[in-house]
């Protein structure tokens, strides 16, 4: 029965994410285009909703006991969040630690295309990306770009230092 509840929670989460992809593309994105001054608050609220969407079904339907972290990370320039990447729940739990606003997550290049919700999310939030298979010259350019982004961004940057699994 517990296994069935886990699968049901996963199905509910996936359906919610697919519906959220449509909302994100057709409501959130255009809203930001019309009201760019509300970017941090709108994207922060949207990301908090997505974190809730991913974690809540596992608690309610699946019976999982997930941590509820304190909101301690300020949304301001110059904040670097370093986390160990253990599961797909790391990002939603990291988002729940923000006092306001949203995180810019350093992500792999392959996640920026053709993945429902995730690819559009990475463009909407302007996530910096890296390509682990890049040659030395490209890797140096990516590091320079990351340095520039980290100095200019208004929100915290999240990085998983161990890279890929």
Regions picked out by a protein language model, each given a short descriptive name:
Residues 1-79, 92-93:
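Membrane-anchoring hydrophobic helices of lipid-metabolizing enzymes
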Residues 60-165:
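Soluble catalytic domains of membrane acyltransferases
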